[in-house]
A protein has these predicted regions:
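C-terminal regulatory/oligomerization modules of transcriptional regulators
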Residues: 1, 120-150
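N-terminal positioning helix adjacent to the helix-turn-helix/winged-helix DNA-binding module
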Residues: 2, 6, 17, 33-34, ...
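N-terminal helix-turn-helix DNA-binding core of bacterial DNA-binding proteins
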Residues: 15, 19-61, 141-144, 150
Length: 150
């Protein structure tokens, strides 16, 4: 039985959408990662670790992204109001304005990407994609990595 390569289709669509989004966000001097971090930090007080988990970013990428946001004056690392040991990512006023403009761009790019779908089909697609993302978030058993022979 021949079926569509779901992994390939998702990868191609994701890659194309990410490229479109990156190009569009250049207009406000943001990357998709920066936009994602700013939006999650604006939602509520969150630590760098919490935001990294929400954004599916590894530790090194998260640190680098927050460093960039700090250099641009868009966010700051601050002590948490609820846990003195933790540092939160606080968005500056400049960062809030950039994130709002960035979100308008994100919404426009998403609308353009899904524009060929009817409203009910679009809603069903986004719902199904969200469910799929939740299902595959836990990758399950990982392949065994064998040591290379020398």
């Amino acid at each position: 039985m021949t079926s569509r390569d779901v992994t390939g289709l998702l990868n191609m669509a994701g890659h194309a959408l990410t490229n479109r989004l990156a190009a569009a966000l250049e207009d406000v001097d943001l990357t998709p990662r920066m936009q994602c971090v700013l939006i999650h930090a604006l939602e509520e007080e969150r630590t760098q670790i919490q935001i990294a988990a929400l954004a599916d970013l590894d530790k090194t990428t998260m640190v680098s992204t927050v460093d960039d946001l700090e250099r641009r004056g868009l966010a700051e690392r601050r002590p948490s109001a609820t846990d003195r040991r933790a540092r939160i990512i606080a968005v500056t006023e400049k960062g809030r304005l950039a994130a709002e403009e960035g979100q308008r761009i994100v919404d426009r790019v998403h609308a353009e990407a899904l524009g060929d779908l009817s409203s009910p089909t679009r809603a069903a697609f986004v719902e199904a994609l969200g469910r799929l993302a939740g299902t595959v978030k836990d990758p399950g058993p990982q392949p065994v990595r064998r040591a290379r022979g020398r």
